[in-house]
């Protein structure tokens, strides 16, 4: 069964991260307990908006910040997702799919491609021409990134996901590369 948890009221990052981790760990545990079963395990997709926050992925280095990290206009959270630093804030929709990729017969690369395709489809619905780039995961409009993607997977179970700028205060990006 797949459930969608949607909240358009700004959420504290640490609260949603804890929720993700609980669902992620529960899905991994369910797989370990009943590996022989072909029965579908519960999957979730959290869609929300965050209070302003910077998150740093595994590839983040201090050079990714243009300002001293202590003087940033929002708090920083270290995560276990792929990618570098990104900003989450009001008027930006963030999606956290907690899926078992084995149930869908795909790997992590294909999962990321599907996320990109879904974002491109949604943007086209609003008349926005967007595309992938060889600069890395994410979606672009012209030379500007409109959607960041950073995912973690373990035992084919995913967490973290995408951040789609809708009407985001872009000044927060002035602090990061």
Model-flagged regions — what are they?
Residues 144-177:
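Catalytic cores of processing enzymes, dominated by hydrolases/peptidases
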């Amino acid at each position: 069964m797949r459930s969608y948890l949607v909240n358009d009221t700004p959420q504290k990052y640490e609260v949603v991260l804890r929720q993700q981790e609980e669902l992620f760990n529960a899905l991994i545990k369910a797989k370990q307990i009943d590996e022989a079963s072909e029965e579908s395990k519960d999957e979730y997709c959290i869609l929300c908006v965050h209070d302003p926050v910077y998150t740093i992925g595994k590839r983040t280095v201090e050079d990714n910040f243009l300002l001293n990290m202590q003087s940033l206009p929002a708090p920083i959270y270290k995560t276990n997702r792929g990618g570098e630093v990104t900003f989450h804030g009001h008027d930006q929709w963030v999606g956290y799919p907690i899926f078992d990729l084995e149930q869908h017969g795909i790997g992590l690369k294909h999962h990321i491609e599907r996320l990109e395709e879904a974002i491109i489809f949604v943007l086209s619905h609003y008349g926005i021409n967007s595309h992938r780039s060889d600069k890395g995961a994410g979606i672009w409009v012209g030379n500007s990134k409109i959607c960041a993607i950073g995912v973690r997977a373990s035992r084919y179970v995913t967490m973290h996901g995408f951040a789609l700028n809708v009407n985001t205060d872009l000044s927060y990006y002035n602090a990061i590369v």
